[in-house]
């Protein structure tokens, strides 16, 4: 027997074909959401309050400080918030201190700052009763970037850009004449020396001393027509603020506010880290030749001689000195922007790699302290110097698409940015109120207006592009949605502008972003998925785990290092499937490694790291595809995406051929019930599980608290699928922490179960499986194999109208008792009733306009006080295709204290469940991108059958395999058949699964032919087919594209107001468009009357269509068509342009256009046809 048996969760064993012992288990898969939000609650909020605190008024007399904050308890729990359509949130209270400097008076108060949405345990938010997910955003990291392009003369030019988190951009560029220019915040370019003079390097000599004698600088100085700091400041001011009178003071304050004011310019900690890393000397001296001797000033020790090449060993020796003392200079400036502060730089001379003997200055920014979140003059000087070094081939340009230069903004940071907007608006209000109100009576509460804060949060959760309605089709869809990375959204890219490079797979994605899972269509490559082992570091960069290789001994250690993309670029990384001996050494002398984007073969003592697992490359959804290594990438992409669309079935079944990921995916998705503490099961019902905790005290087990886990029963998901949990433990079972005790939708025995295992034959059958169509056995319908439950929600509200309140009642005018048989005394349908299209769900009447009463009615009214009830029926009815069984009714009223929108007195929600069996036109798919539509459901006895007499359940077309190159499905077919016959479940992990030989061996073990083929017999004749056929067991999914949701038919219905043509689409109950090409077809056949009918009475001849309807109902002949409405519209259009247009007949007589006559309108109303753009039966 090949493979070994492993435990997949508590309830199932699988035989795995894996050969690699994984040293690291999978992390918590929704950690990216939870960690980020936790950071926000613990630190993000505090940072925000520190940023705006203290707020002072314009005189500096009143000071408002934020001291501390706390979150209270939420008003409703998660389930109740969903039920009541409210936001799951907790009140945020902030401790505020107001100081009056004149009187020395201090007032402290706790101020309520609005309800703050909380994250649920599963990483979602509940906003107005709907579950939403905040998707992480991939953006360019703030830093300094260098780029190169070739101009039209074939000359290489460079550009540099300093990108902050928020604030003005600073760009450097060269032109054809070798002059260096700078742009401040996308304005016109000025010579870079003007900016240097403004920083305080007034004279040419100072600039040349600072940057070295360089021809580029000399060219720039020639171009520069300023000669002092003052002139430079005025020049810059005129560029940034044209038309305003320039003064030196204004210019200084403008530059300070643009770049050196922390409130206006923010690099964020990540920007400071990236900037220091890029400009630090240790990265810039690597592989360069020194032009000076490096000596330790304190001890006189020589680190490196002049003329020495700095390789990695020398670099490691001098790094501590670079951090400490070598090369530091303080430059004094005069009259610059920051007055006379010294600029702290670090400078070392090297030889030019391209011109012999030329000395180049390398200037670092002197390791600016991490607390400086704004740019400093040292940064600017150092960035300009790096740019000049590039012109002499020292340094490197940056790749924007490298994941070392793109970072993630997760929930916490996105929320923080939004909260910052709200707080800054609030700060403005506070300042205004401080100056207006009486300073003695003032309190913190009176100053603070929390409206802008609440509004900005509401806006973010309600309408931001990154706050999305959770995809809840199945557990995998939920999980993937929380791990999604989007490059779109505010501050990101747009679909139209994103080019090819951004979307492409990059070598730095390895182990960080999945190269497979991304949508097809306009968003391809812009929306990605996090790889299975990846995590996010404090700066927002994606890290992936690696096993360290000990450089001395060559042992692969079990301790794990997490590396970001730019850290990894300098190392040789071996694959996870490199064979190791018992001690953990590489078996082979030469090991295949990756370094940047290249695949190299290196000696085993040169390997730095090794992958932890073969599946660390791919995302969770892709890691669920068995034999992924045998599939073409395009089809694997479809497979990953279609697993997310699988509908939860009535009776789910885990796959016989899995990848070993099924348990982890189910556990972390949040749909299964996971034990929080170890203990023993005390009670199990369909609705709850009780587990008694036990603690060990002095070696004895002592009973502790009781944990109660409630099951969700038949609840509607966001996508209308059914959420239903059921227990899978029995009374008396011992439970460990993390065990799955209850299955949710699409899980079975604690494993993800998106579809069913079915017997499939690959053969053609009478053309019924031509072009990917699927032939199905009726047995799958009879046995409810692919039956799913769908729940739809309908609501009706009783409002206050101008003519009086609407009323929910059983007493509806002109409705017979038969139609009311399922309503209770309130007029609301009872739970459990079976209903058809058009049945009443909630009886409701609305007052009609008051009419003049006749004398008799007035008399009756005077005697009985009862006016003839003037109401019309506005009941909620079941729409087309909505029939099913009522599973739940919820009634909310003002009297019960429910929060309802203004003007609404009563709200009724009705939930209808439908059992949908699989039917012709439904879409099905395997896990390898092999999708198709059901073409025919055939009687079981007519299906081809196996030698033992059992019929196959599905017949697929073998032509769907070779051209698509997804051979994984064939291997799955073989292995699945063997597993079914052996009665086992198998696991074949991605890139480390069963080899071809092992599949054949398992087939033989099960007593099947090694080629997996068998003789099949025709079910209709009993004759064997000519050739042996591949038959096996495949895991097939039923996808959310169900024919019941798409099928649609219309007789009459709503018409568009202007053109009077039928509306389009199922949602509007529209008609089918008879388009240009269809008209040509009728013309080609010469079907004149059919064509006339289609263009007139079936479309927009208003009078004609009413008459036609009447004629059909009365059984008369259909009348002559009139003039179509759209023709009248055309004439009106021409008349509106001032043309006199008439219609003439063949003998030049003017034709009067017949308008709708009164009698016709009456007829239309009789026939229940609404002509004025309203819809049928709408009122």
Swiss-Prot record:
First-tier enzyme category under EC: transferase
Region (Disordered): 1153-1179
Gene Ontology molecular function: any one: ribonucleoside binding
Pfam families, per database record: RNA_pol_Rpb2_1 (PF04563), RNA_pol_Rpb2_2 (PF04561), RNA_pol_Rpb2_3 (PF04565), RNA_pol_Rpb2_45 (PF10385), RNA_pol_Rpb2_6 (PF00562), RNA_pol_Rpb2_7 (PF04560)
Catalysis performed (reactions): RNA(n) + a ribonucleoside 5'-triphosphate = RNA(n+1) + diphosphate
InterPro entries per UniProt: DNA-dir_RNA_pol_bsu_ext_1_sf, DNA-dir_RNA_pol_bsu_external_1, DNA-dir_RNA_pol_su2, DNA-dir_RNAP_su2_dom, DNA-dir_RNAP_su2_hyb_sf, RNA_pol_bsu_bac, RNA_pol_bsu_CS, RNA_pol_bsu_protrusion
SUPFAM superfamilies: beta and beta-prime subunits of DNA dependent RNA-polymerase (SSF64484)
One Gene Ontology term, aspect cellular component: DNA-directed RNA polymerase complex
Any single biological process term in GO: DNA-templated transcription
Enzyme Commission code: 2.7.7.6
Entry keyword set: DNA-directed RNA polymerase, Nucleotidyltransferase, Transcription, Transferase
Keyword Transferase among UniProt keywords: yes
TM regions (residue ranges): none
Biased composition range(s): Acidic residues: 1153-1162
Quaternary state and interactors: The RNAP catalytic core consists of 2 alpha, 1 beta, 1 beta' and 1 omega subunit. When a sigma factor is associated with the core the holoenzyme is formed, which can initiate transcription.
Function: DNA-dependent RNA polymerase catalyzes the transcription of DNA into RNA using the four ribonucleoside triphosphates as substrates.
Annotated protein name in UniProt: DNA-directed RNA polymerase subunit beta
